[in-house]
Protein backbone atom coordinates (compact mmCIF):
# COMPACT_ATOMS: atom_id res chain seq x y z
CA UNK A 1 0.00 0.00 0.00
CA UNK A 2 1.43 3.38 -0.94
CA UNK A 3 -0.61 5.45 1.50
CA UNK A 4 -1.00 8.18 -1.12
CA UNK A 5 -3.89 9.09 -3.38
CA UNK A 6 -2.13 11.30 -5.91
CA UNK A 7 -0.58 13.97 -3.69
CA UNK A 8 -3.05 13.39 -0.85
CA UNK A 9 -2.88 11.17 2.22
CA UNK A 10 0.47 10.19 3.70
CA UNK A 11 1.62 9.86 7.31
CA UNK A 12 2.26 13.26 8.90
CA UNK A 13 2.75 12.00 12.44
CA UNK A 14 5.34 12.12 15.23
CA UNK A 15 7.90 9.28 15.45
CA UNK A 16 6.03 7.83 18.44
CA UNK A 17 3.06 6.97 16.24
CA UNK A 18 5.04 5.74 13.22
CA UNK A 19 5.81 2.28 14.60
CA UNK A 20 2.19 1.71 15.56
CA UNK A 21 1.10 2.66 12.03
CA UNK A 22 3.66 0.32 10.45
CA UNK A 23 2.48 -2.52 12.70
CA UNK A 24 -1.16 -1.71 11.90
CA UNK A 25 -0.54 -1.71 8.15
CA UNK A 26 1.31 -5.02 8.36
CA UNK A 27 -1.46 -6.68 10.38
CA UNK A 28 -4.20 -5.27 8.17
CA UNK A 29 -2.47 -6.54 5.01
CA UNK A 30 -2.16 -10.01 6.56
CA UNK A 31 -5.76 -10.01 7.84
CA UNK A 32 -7.13 -9.01 4.42
CA UNK A 33 -5.46 -12.05 2.84
CA UNK A 34 -6.55 -14.35 5.67
CA UNK A 35 -9.67 -16.30 4.68
CA UNK A 36 -10.59 -17.01 8.31
CA UNK A 37 -10.40 -13.34 9.28
CA UNK A 38 -12.54 -12.21 6.34
CA UNK A 39 -15.02 -14.98 7.00
CA UNK A 40 -15.34 -13.93 10.64
CA UNK A 41 -15.80 -10.31 9.55
CA UNK A 42 -18.54 -11.31 7.11
CA UNK A 43 -20.16 -13.50 9.77
CA UNK A 44 -20.55 -10.52 12.14
CA UNK A 45 -21.77 -8.22 9.35
CA UNK A 46 -24.47 -10.76 8.58
CA UNK A 47 -25.45 -12.17 11.97
CA UNK A 48 -24.79 -9.15 14.18
CA UNK A 49 -25.39 -6.14 11.95
CA UNK A 50 -28.07 -7.64 9.69
CA UNK A 51 -26.40 -7.29 6.29
CA UNK A 52 -27.03 -7.19 3.42
CA UNK A 53 -29.05 -3.99 3.74
CA UNK A 54 -31.84 -3.52 1.16
CA UNK A 55 -31.63 -1.34 -1.92
CA UNK A 56 -35.08 0.20 -1.72
CA UNK A 57 -36.93 1.72 -4.67
CA UNK A 58 -38.42 4.97 -3.32
CA UNK A 59 -41.46 4.81 -5.56
CA UNK A 60 -43.52 7.57 -3.91
CA UNK A 61 -40.62 10.01 -3.93
CA UNK A 62 -39.75 9.09 -7.53
CA UNK A 63 -43.32 9.66 -8.71
CA UNK A 64 -43.68 12.95 -6.87
CA UNK A 65 -40.43 14.34 -8.29
CA UNK A 66 -41.37 13.05 -11.73
CA UNK A 67 -37.92 12.26 -13.09
CA UNK A 68 -35.19 9.73 -12.42
CA UNK A 69 -35.82 6.55 -10.45
CA UNK A 70 -34.51 6.92 -6.90
CA UNK A 71 -33.13 3.96 -4.98
CA UNK A 72 -32.06 4.19 -1.34
CA UNK A 73 -29.24 2.05 0.02
CA UNK A 74 -30.65 1.39 3.47
CA UNK A 75 -27.61 1.68 5.75
CA UNK A 76 -30.03 3.06 8.35
CA UNK A 77 -31.17 -0.53 8.89
CA UNK A 78 -27.80 -1.68 10.26
CA UNK A 79 -27.48 -2.54 13.95
CA UNK A 80 -26.85 0.81 15.76
CA UNK A 81 -28.60 2.67 12.93
CA UNK A 82 -25.86 3.71 10.52
CA UNK A 83 -23.02 2.58 8.27
CA UNK A 84 -20.48 3.09 11.08
CA UNK A 85 -20.74 -0.50 12.35
CA UNK A 86 -19.30 -1.92 9.08
CA UNK A 87 -15.95 -0.32 9.81
CA UNK A 88 -15.98 -0.80 13.57
CA UNK A 89 -16.53 -4.56 13.36
CA UNK A 90 -13.55 -4.81 11.00
CA UNK A 91 -11.24 -2.71 13.15
CA UNK A 92 -12.20 -4.37 16.44
CA UNK A 93 -11.63 -7.82 14.94
CA UNK A 94 -8.22 -6.51 13.90
CA UNK A 95 -7.59 -5.21 17.44
CA UNK A 96 -8.48 -8.65 18.78
CA UNK A 97 -6.10 -10.26 16.30
CA UNK A 98 -3.34 -7.90 17.51
CA UNK A 99 -4.07 -8.79 21.17
CA UNK A 100 -5.04 -5.24 22.15
CA UNK A 101 -7.19 -5.19 25.28
CA UNK A 102 -8.47 -1.62 25.04
CA UNK A 103 -10.06 0.37 22.23
CA UNK A 104 -10.48 4.13 21.96
CA UNK A 105 -12.39 6.23 19.45
CA UNK A 106 -13.37 9.80 18.67
CA UNK A 107 -16.96 10.66 17.90
CA UNK A 108 -18.87 13.71 16.65
CA UNK A 109 -22.54 12.87 16.32
CA UNK A 110 -21.99 9.94 18.65
CA UNK A 111 -22.80 7.31 16.00
CA UNK A 112 -19.22 6.07 15.66
CA UNK A 113 -18.87 6.15 19.45
CA UNK A 114 -22.01 4.07 19.88
CA UNK A 115 -20.89 1.60 17.22
CA UNK A 116 -17.45 1.26 18.84
CA UNK A 117 -18.93 0.85 22.32
CA UNK A 118 -21.36 -1.73 20.92
CA UNK A 119 -18.68 -3.89 19.31
CA UNK A 120 -16.36 -3.48 22.32
CA UNK A 121 -19.14 -4.75 24.58
CA UNK A 122 -19.69 -7.77 22.39
CA UNK A 123 -15.97 -8.62 22.21
CA UNK A 124 -15.44 -7.89 25.92
CA UNK A 125 -12.98 -5.01 25.47
CA UNK A 126 -12.36 -1.93 27.56
CA UNK A 127 -13.58 1.13 25.65
CA UNK A 128 -13.06 4.88 25.99
CA UNK A 129 -14.71 7.43 23.71
CA UNK A 130 -13.47 11.00 23.26
CA UNK A 131 -16.17 13.51 22.44
CA UNK A 132 -16.16 17.30 22.21
CA UNK A 133 -18.08 19.03 24.99
CA UNK A 134 -20.24 20.87 22.42
CA UNK A 135 -21.19 17.59 20.75
CA UNK A 136 -21.95 16.02 24.13
CA UNK A 137 -24.58 18.75 24.65
CA UNK A 138 -26.07 18.20 21.19
CA UNK A 139 -26.12 14.41 21.42
CA UNK A 140 -26.97 13.61 25.03
CA UNK A 141 -28.95 10.55 23.97
CA UNK A 142 -25.95 8.94 22.27
CA UNK A 143 -23.72 9.81 25.23
CA UNK A 144 -26.00 7.91 27.59
CA UNK A 145 -26.23 5.08 25.08
CA UNK A 146 -22.43 4.69 25.10
CA UNK A 147 -22.40 4.62 28.89
CA UNK A 148 -25.16 2.00 28.87
CA UNK A 149 -22.90 -0.10 26.66
CA UNK A 150 -20.15 0.10 29.27
CA UNK A 151 -17.92 2.68 27.62
CA UNK A 152 -16.24 5.59 29.37
CA UNK A 153 -17.09 8.90 27.66
CA UNK A 154 -14.41 11.57 28.08
CA UNK A 155 -15.45 15.18 27.32
CA UNK A 156 -12.93 17.18 25.30
CA UNK A 157 -12.77 20.82 26.41
CA UNK A 158 -9.97 22.11 24.15
CA UNK A 159 -10.31 24.15 20.94
CA UNK A 160 -13.80 24.26 19.48
CA UNK A 161 -14.81 21.29 21.68
CA UNK A 162 -16.00 19.33 18.65
CA UNK A 163 -14.88 16.42 16.48
CA UNK A 164 -11.50 17.80 15.41
CA UNK A 165 -10.51 18.26 19.06
CA UNK A 166 -11.80 14.81 19.99
CA UNK A 167 -9.49 13.34 17.32
CA UNK A 168 -6.52 15.23 18.81
CA UNK A 169 -7.27 13.88 22.29
CA UNK A 170 -7.70 10.33 21.00
CA UNK A 171 -4.32 10.53 19.24
CA UNK A 172 -2.73 11.81 22.47
CA UNK A 173 -4.16 8.90 24.40
CA UNK A 174 -3.07 6.41 21.74
CA UNK A 175 0.55 7.64 21.83
CA UNK A 176 0.59 7.19 25.61
CA UNK A 177 -0.98 3.72 25.65
CA UNK A 178 0.22 2.35 22.36
CA UNK A 179 1.09 -1.15 23.64
CA UNK A 180 -2.36 -2.22 24.83
CA UNK A 181 -4.62 0.20 22.93
CA UNK A 182 -6.14 0.14 19.44
CA UNK A 183 -7.41 3.44 18.01
CA UNK A 184 -10.62 2.88 16.03
CA UNK A 185 -10.89 5.81 13.60
CA UNK A 186 -14.45 6.46 12.44
CA UNK A 187 -13.93 7.76 8.92
CA UNK A 188 -11.64 7.61 5.88
CA UNK A 189 -9.34 10.14 7.54
CA UNK A 190 -6.10 10.18 9.52
CA UNK A 191 -2.66 8.86 8.60
CA UNK A 192 -2.14 5.86 6.32
CA UNK A 193 -3.29 3.03 6.60
CA UNK A 194 -6.55 4.35 8.13
CA UNK A 195 -8.16 5.91 5.00
CA UNK A 196 -7.53 2.71 3.01
CA UNK A 197 -8.52 0.40 5.86
CA UNK A 198 -11.80 2.20 6.61
CA UNK A 199 -12.66 2.29 2.91
CA UNK A 200 -12.01 -1.45 2.62
CA UNK A 201 -14.30 -2.16 5.57
CA UNK A 202 -16.99 0.17 4.16
CA UNK A 203 -16.87 -0.97 0.53
CA UNK A 204 -19.41 -3.67 1.42
CA UNK A 205 -22.02 -0.90 0.89
CA UNK A 206 -21.06 -0.37 -2.75
CA UNK A 207 -20.40 -4.06 -3.43
CA UNK A 208 -23.94 -4.88 -2.29
CA UNK A 209 -25.52 -1.89 -4.05
CA UNK A 210 -23.87 -2.83 -7.34
CA UNK A 211 -25.09 -6.41 -7.17
CA UNK A 212 -28.57 -5.29 -6.09
CA UNK A 213 -29.06 -2.69 -8.83
CA UNK A 214 -27.92 -5.17 -11.50
CA UNK A 215 -30.47 -7.60 -10.12
CA UNK A 216 -33.28 -5.04 -10.06
CA UNK A 217 -32.55 -3.00 -13.18
CA UNK A 218 -30.14 -5.13 -15.19
CA UNK A 219 -27.73 -2.19 -15.40
CA UNK A 220 -25.60 0.17 -13.35
CA UNK A 221 -27.00 3.48 -12.01
CA UNK A 222 -26.35 6.82 -13.69
CA UNK A 223 -25.65 8.54 -10.37
CA UNK A 224 -24.45 7.46 -6.93
CA UNK A 225 -24.95 10.18 -4.31
CA UNK A 226 -23.72 10.27 -0.71
CA UNK A 227 -23.10 12.86 2.01
CA UNK A 228 -19.51 13.73 2.88
CA UNK A 229 -18.14 14.73 6.28
CA UNK A 230 -14.94 12.73 6.60
CA UNK A 231 -16.48 10.67 3.85
CA UNK A 232 -16.56 6.99 4.85
CA UNK A 233 -20.14 6.23 3.82
CA UNK A 234 -19.45 7.95 0.49
CA UNK A 235 -16.13 6.18 -0.07
CA UNK A 236 -17.81 2.89 0.83
CA UNK A 237 -20.49 3.24 -1.82
CA UNK A 238 -18.27 5.00 -4.42
CA UNK A 239 -15.29 2.64 -4.39
CA UNK A 240 -16.80 -0.37 -6.23
CA UNK A 241 -18.07 1.99 -8.96
CA UNK A 242 -14.83 3.91 -9.58
CA UNK A 243 -13.84 1.86 -12.64
CA UNK A 244 -17.36 2.17 -14.09
CA UNK A 245 -16.80 5.51 -15.79
CA UNK A 246 -20.44 5.85 -16.90
CA UNK A 247 -21.54 6.07 -13.25
CA UNK A 248 -21.38 9.64 -11.93
CA UNK A 249 -20.26 9.88 -8.30
CA UNK A 250 -21.52 12.87 -6.31
CA UNK A 251 -20.50 13.77 -2.77
CA UNK A 252 -22.65 16.27 -0.87
CA UNK A 253 -21.04 18.43 1.80
CA UNK A 254 -22.71 20.48 4.52
CA UNK A 255 -23.21 24.11 3.50
CA UNK A 256 -24.66 24.99 6.91
CA UNK A 257 -26.17 28.48 6.81
CA UNK A 258 -24.72 29.05 3.36
CA UNK A 259 -21.38 28.65 1.66
CA UNK A 260 -20.59 32.39 1.87
CA UNK A 261 -21.55 32.83 5.54
CA UNK A 262 -18.50 31.17 7.08
CA UNK A 263 -20.93 28.90 8.94
CA UNK A 264 -20.53 25.68 6.98
CA UNK A 265 -18.35 22.57 6.66
CA UNK A 266 -17.72 22.44 2.91
CA UNK A 267 -13.99 21.67 2.76
CA UNK A 268 -14.11 20.72 -0.93
CA UNK A 269 -16.00 23.82 -2.01
CA UNK A 270 -14.17 26.39 0.10
CA UNK A 271 -11.05 24.67 1.43
CA UNK A 272 -7.39 24.56 0.45
CA UNK A 273 -4.77 21.84 0.67
CA UNK A 274 -3.07 21.36 4.03
CA UNK A 275 -2.20 18.84 6.71
CA UNK A 276 -4.45 17.77 9.60
CA UNK A 277 -4.67 14.60 11.69
CA UNK A 278 -1.71 13.01 9.91
CA UNK A 279 -2.96 13.43 6.32
CA UNK A 280 -2.68 15.88 3.46
CA UNK A 281 -6.10 16.85 2.12
CA UNK A 282 -8.54 19.73 1.56
CA UNK A 283 -9.11 21.68 4.77
CA UNK A 284 -11.04 24.73 5.91
CA UNK A 285 -8.14 26.87 7.10
CA UNK A 286 -7.09 30.51 7.19
CA UNK A 287 -4.05 32.06 5.45
CA UNK A 288 -1.85 30.97 8.36
CA UNK A 289 -3.03 27.37 8.05
CA UNK A 290 -5.11 27.55 11.23
CA UNK A 291 -8.17 25.31 11.11
CA UNK A 292 -11.35 27.35 10.92
CA UNK A 293 -14.43 26.62 13.02
CA UNK A 294 -16.99 24.61 11.07
CA UNK A 295 -20.74 24.36 11.41
CA UNK A 296 -23.59 22.14 10.28
CA UNK A 297 -26.98 21.26 11.72
CA UNK A 298 -25.73 17.71 11.47
CA UNK A 299 -23.00 16.88 14.01
CA UNK A 300 -21.69 14.08 11.79
CA UNK A 301 -20.73 16.42 8.94
CA UNK A 302 -19.00 19.25 10.78
CA UNK A 303 -15.43 18.07 10.17
CA UNK A 304 -13.02 20.72 8.79
CA UNK A 305 -11.39 18.32 6.32
CA UNK A 306 -12.26 15.40 4.10
CA UNK A 307 -10.75 11.96 3.46
CA UNK A 308 -7.66 12.13 1.19
CA UNK A 309 -9.11 9.69 -1.35
CA UNK A 310 -12.05 12.07 -1.85
CA UNK A 311 -9.57 14.91 -2.41
CA UNK A 312 -7.96 12.75 -5.09
CA UNK A 313 -11.31 11.83 -6.70
CA UNK A 314 -12.13 15.54 -6.89
CA UNK A 315 -8.75 16.51 -8.34
CA UNK A 316 -8.82 13.69 -10.89
CA UNK A 317 -12.42 14.63 -11.81
CA UNK A 318 -13.72 11.13 -11.06
CA UNK A 319 -16.20 12.45 -8.51
CA UNK A 320 -18.03 15.75 -8.21
CA UNK A 321 -18.56 17.49 -4.87
CA UNK A 322 -21.56 19.71 -4.24
CA UNK A 323 -23.27 20.96 -1.09
CA UNK A 324 -26.63 21.32 0.64
CA UNK A 325 -27.62 23.83 3.31
CA UNK A 326 -29.22 23.14 6.70
CA UNK A 327 -32.49 24.34 5.25
CA UNK A 328 -32.35 22.00 2.25
CA UNK A 329 -31.36 19.06 4.45
CA UNK A 330 -34.25 19.77 6.84
CA UNK A 331 -36.71 19.92 3.96
CA UNK A 332 -35.43 16.58 2.64
CA UNK A 333 -35.59 15.12 6.16
CA UNK A 334 -39.28 16.05 6.44
CA UNK A 335 -39.99 15.03 2.89
CA UNK A 336 -38.62 11.50 3.10
CA UNK A 337 -40.32 10.98 6.46
CA UNK A 338 -43.71 11.93 5.06
CA UNK A 339 -43.35 10.44 1.58
CA UNK A 340 -41.72 7.10 2.32
CA UNK A 341 -42.14 6.69 6.08
CA UNK A 342 -38.37 6.66 6.55
CA UNK A 343 -36.81 9.18 8.95
CA UNK A 344 -33.25 9.74 7.68
CA UNK A 345 -30.24 10.99 9.61
CA UNK A 346 -29.65 14.71 8.99
CA UNK A 347 -26.32 13.70 7.45
CA UNK A 348 -28.03 11.47 4.88
CA UNK A 349 -30.67 14.16 4.30
CA UNK A 350 -27.93 16.30 2.69
CA UNK A 351 -27.41 13.64 0.00
CA UNK A 352 -31.14 13.29 -0.38
CA UNK A 353 -31.58 17.06 -0.77
CA UNK A 354 -29.22 17.08 -3.74
CA UNK A 355 -30.81 13.99 -5.28
CA UNK A 356 -34.22 15.66 -5.01
CA UNK A 357 -32.87 18.69 -6.89
CA UNK A 358 -31.29 16.51 -9.56
CA UNK A 359 -34.02 13.92 -10.20
CA UNK A 360 -36.70 16.18 -11.78
CA UNK A 361 -34.14 17.33 -14.40
CA UNK A 362 -33.47 13.76 -15.53
CA UNK A 363 -35.62 11.33 -17.51
CA UNK A 364 -37.58 8.37 -16.21
CA UNK A 365 -34.89 6.12 -17.68
CA UNK A 366 -32.22 7.50 -15.37
CA UNK A 367 -31.32 5.77 -12.12
CA UNK A 368 -30.03 7.42 -8.94
CA UNK A 369 -28.77 5.54 -5.89
CA UNK A 370 -28.67 7.59 -2.69
CA UNK A 371 -26.71 6.21 0.23
CA UNK A 372 -29.08 6.54 3.18
CA UNK A 373 -26.18 6.35 5.60
CA UNK A 374 -28.14 6.44 8.85
CA UNK A 375 -31.51 6.75 10.56
CA UNK A 376 -32.79 9.96 12.06
CA UNK A 377 -33.82 8.93 15.58
CA UNK A 378 -30.80 10.76 16.98
CA UNK A 379 -31.88 13.97 15.21
CA UNK A 380 -35.50 14.19 16.32
CA UNK A 381 -34.58 16.56 19.19
CA UNK A 382 -32.59 18.84 16.89
CA UNK A 383 -35.37 19.02 14.32
CA UNK A 384 -38.02 19.63 17.00
CA UNK A 385 -35.95 22.54 18.33
CA UNK A 386 -35.63 24.08 14.86
CA UNK A 387 -39.39 23.75 14.37
CA UNK A 388 -39.99 25.32 17.78
CA UNK A 389 -41.50 22.18 19.28
CA UNK A 390 -40.92 21.52 23.00
CA UNK A 391 -40.24 17.85 23.71
From Swiss-Prot:
EC number(s) from the headed UniProt entry: 4.2.1.20
MF terms (GO), sorted A to Z: tryptophan synthase activity
Membrane-spanning ranges: none
Pfam families (UniProt xref): PALP
Keywords: Amino-acid biosynthesis, Aromatic amino acid biosynthesis, Lyase, Pyridoxal phosphate, Tryptophan biosynthesis
Pathway named in the protein's UniProt entry: Amino-acid biosynthesis; L-tryptophan biosynthesis; L-tryptophan from chorismate: step 5/5
Catalytic reaction(s) noted: (1S,2R)-1-C-(indol-3-yl)glycerol 3-phosphate + L-serine = D-glyceraldehyde 3-phosphate + L-tryptophan + H2O
Cofactor: pyridoxal 5'-phosphate
Similarity comment: family membership: Belongs to the TrpB family.
Subunit-structure text: Tetramer of two alpha and two beta chains.
NCBIfam families per UniProt: trpB
Function statement: The beta subunit is responsible for the synthesis of L-tryptophan from indole and L-serine.
Entry protein name: Tryptophan synthase beta chain
Source organism of the structure: Thermoanaerobacter pseudethanolicus (strain ATCC 33223 / 39E) (Clostridium thermohydrosulfuricum)
Gene of this entry: trpB
